[in-house]
Amino acid sequence: MFPSPALTHTPFSVKDILNLEQQQRSLAAGDLSARLEATLAPASCMLAAFKPDGYSGPEAAAPGLAELRAELGPAPSPPKCSPAFPTAPTFYPRAYGDPDPAKDPRADKKELCALQKAVELDKAETDGAERRRPRRRRKPRVLFSQAQVYELERRFKQQRYLSPAERDQLASVLKLTSTQVKIWFQNRRYKCKRQRQDQTLELLGPPPPPARRIAVPVLVRDGKPCLGDSAAYAPAYGLGLNAYGYNAYPYPGYGGAACSPAYSCAAYPAAPPAAHAPAASANSNFVNFGVGDLNTVQSPGMPQGNSGVSTLHGIRAW
């Protein structure tokens, strides 16, 4: 049933609340009829295209259908509403990496080759521009004549620093620029400074060698002798005082007297015993010796005729 047009629609009235279910049913029926018409319309067109010549439509098959439609009146138009199921989109985006049928792989290769050629051309242009750029040449060194150097040296001895006016005047006289005169004076002052430094270094001489550290033993500490420390520096070997005995005669084969008792000593006068031959004590460290007949005391290899030469046995030098 469809609501009558005479009724007023108030959203908060009791009738509208009660008739809400009926309105929803009518909307659902209208939506269903619209869908059926949309789906059946192509089928009816197809049937009309293939119908036989003797078929004139549903009115000819049912003669009372037109009168029934006239009595019922025109069917109400269904309300427009959005479909329950949205229609599928007509365009699907192509996923990344899917092959494009419209593109040919040969076209991709051609594009890649064109890009590579463009990059190579750009690189060649940049290299050519860098090569064409002229290098900055160094200014040639200014060579002064002997007259100019002589005049500059003479002025430098008089005045080491010049004012701008004096510098311009000297440059005009020497036919130089003010900058050249300025740089020459700067270099000359630096040269004098280096010469003074070298002379000072020559006068000072070479630097002294670094001090060497020598270990010295500590013998006394706080007024007390360091016995423990000095024992470590004792000599590695000891010297005895009585390494040799001096009381023993070095030649035991000979007697105590220089002259043999078999020969006589009458030819020479005897000296006083107290002056020349003191008595030797047993505890004396020195060895006494006597001189007898020099002719009779001879060495085994010498003849007896040599009376002036004799050997003195038992003499020690102290």
From Swiss-Prot:
Residue ranges that the Swiss-Prot or TrEMBL entry lists as coiled coil: none
SMART domains on file: HOX (SM00389)
The protein's assembly and partners: Homodimer (via the homeobox); binds DNA as homodimer. Interacts (via the homeobox) with TBX5 (via the T-box); this complex binds DNA. Interacts with HIPK1 and HIPK2, but not HIPK3. Interacts with the C-terminal zinc finger of GATA4 through its homeobox domain. Also interacts with JARID2 which represses its ability to activate transcription of ANF. Interacts with FBLIM1. Interacts with TBX18. Interacts with histone methyltransferase NSD2 (via HMG box). Interacts with NEDD9. Interacts with TBX1.
DNA-binding region(s) from the entry: 137-196
Cross-referenced Pfam families: Homeodomain
Keywords: Developmental protein, DNA-binding, Homeobox, Nucleus
A GO molecular function held by the record: DNA-binding transcription activator activity, RNA polymerase II-specific
Main location: nucleus
Protein name: Homeobox protein Nkx-2.5
One Gene Ontology biological process: hemopoiesis
